Amino acid sequence: MTLMEDAKKGVITPEIEAVAKAEGIDAEIVRSCVAKGLVAIPKNARRDTLPVGIGKYMSTKINANVGTSRDCIDIDAEIEKAKAAEAFGAHAVMDLSTGGDLDEIRTRILKAVNIPVGTVPIYQAAASRKIVVEMSSDDMFNAVRKHAEQGVDFVTVHAGVNLNSLERLRQSDRIMNVVSRGGSFTLAWMLHNGEDNPFYAEFDYLLEIAKEYDMTLSLGDGMRPGCIADASDRPKFMEFITLGELVKRSREANVQTFVEGPGHVPLNEIELSVRGMKELCDGAPLYLLGPLVTDIAPGFDHITGAIGGAVAGMHGTDFLCMVTPSEHLALPSIEDIKEGLLVTKLAAHTIDLIKEGPRERAWKQDTAMAYARRDLDWEKQFELAIDGDRARKIRDARKTESDACSMCGELCAVKIVKEAFGEKKEEE
């Protein structure tokens, strides 16, 4: 029996209880949201790991991508990245490996972290053949089953990419066409074989596998726009419509889902994308990479992604995939992972400040920082800071004899007003 089945029957499972406790809300609220598909708790029945709630009333969660490429194969380094991601605050890790022994990398990551682990099975299916288009539908489904058997908690499947998507793409004026790796594999396969996407055509079989292992489906955004000029076009929204239909079928099969999107999007179109996704997908949890709000920032795309993520959070995003400074340039290093996670944590916190559910706890953190700043309590500020070590290093590098910072010293506004109020009270 899956977690969603239990929730529909009114059962508050240990996973639901754990999420409720972590989020500080009533377990019945969590159960109801899981039953309706508004919250997902990605946890494979074969894996004993920390339950993490994603969706309505939940604090905003963060995923970190790790994994080899065919040009950079260092398995130990990727394991260390996964561990570092968990240590730096990621709530989930995805193994996107395409080079080396994919089974070894995946099993080692599953053992190395105590948070949900996701994968993209089509990468392994493609690796089993010399050419991507030569993989069979059996290769695709066998890869999904293998990952499920090994304990993977959620898998990205680009089931919304189908022959209809292909036709929309042909009729579009896109500059970047398709930038999703899994989406490009799928489109190339359909064109070569003259058949529809097996993950779409045989979606019921995919649901059978997911249900057997209580594995969550992350419905991938294979048609996401890869540049600002392509944002909010027909291929993108056509996929959202299809994904919404697949969300409904998944819920009927008692399989948990969340939905990925929406690519590169200018600030003024983020609300349209996110609200559109939420509406078309019946409130399913949304999992976004970014969105990236400009195309001219290689080396700084962790910042463009955090800006987009924060704005998207105002309109319903639940799960942010961190972007690193290496995006569009290279495989990320551990330092890139840390930097990407920190700016994404900032974006997530700004979302939580206004999100129903985590809002009260987030406000307490900011209020505590306000009091610490008012009191010039530096140790408390470092304790509350999102990266206290960095804050301490900056202050220590340019210290002043004043108890204020070296920017203002004795001219510190907080210090002046504090002393002025103190003198007034003494006179009174």
From Swiss-Prot:
Stored InterPro entries: ThiC, ThiC/Bza_core_dom, ThiC/BzaA/B
GO biological process: thiamine biosynthetic process; thiamine diphosphate biosynthetic process
UniProt catalytic activity: 5-amino-1-(5-phospho-beta-D-ribosyl)imidazole + S-adenosyl-L-methionine = 4-amino-2-methyl-5-(phosphooxymethyl)pyrimidine + CO + 5'-deoxyadenosine + formate + L-methionine + 3 H(+)
UniProt binding sites for Zn(2+): H264, H328
Keywords linked to the UniProt accession: 4Fe-4S, Iron, Iron-sulfur, Lyase, Metal-binding, S-adenosyl-L-methionine, Thiamine biosynthesis, Zinc
Cofactor field: [4Fe-4S] cluster
Binding site for substrate: N65, M94, Y123, H158, S180, R181, G182, D221, G222, M223, R224, E260, Y287
Cofactor binding, note field: Binds 1 [4Fe-4S] cluster per subunit. The cluster is coordinated with 3 cysteines and an exchangeable S-adenosyl-L-methionine.
Family as reported in the entry's similarity comment: Belongs to the ThiC family.
Xref: HAMAP family: ThiC
Protein name, as recorded: Phosphomethylpyrimidine synthase 1
Organism: Methanosarcina mazei (strain ATCC BAA-159 / DSM 3647 / Goe1 / Go1 / JCM 11833 / OCM 88)
Gene of this entry: thiC1
